[in-house]
Amino acid sequence: MKDGFLKAAALSPALRVADCAYNTRQILTELRAAAARGVKLAVFPEFCLTGYTCGDLFLQRTLQQGALTGLQELLDASRELDTVALVGLPLMVRGKLYNCAAVFCRGRRRHAAL
């Protein structure tokens, strides 16, 4: 923090629809670069782990699991970073699919906003 302000960034990595592994790598690259620039709050687009235009694929367990796997990889990699990140992903809760934002920092998920 400098003069009571923190550096925030809205980031928009290159994504591929339904390619969670690729999207995770792109998000991580952007997150690491932002952290190196002193960004303390990094905000990524909704559904950035899956791509926004998946349509009926959002209902497929394979895509949902891919997003959760990607989120875990981001959590693990964030242990070394002092940046709070928000990433969008589909999340199945009690049989209902939600458009969520996961909030994490230093390897720990802090919140999932539905």
What are these regions (language model features)?
Residues 1-114:
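Hydrophobic structural segments
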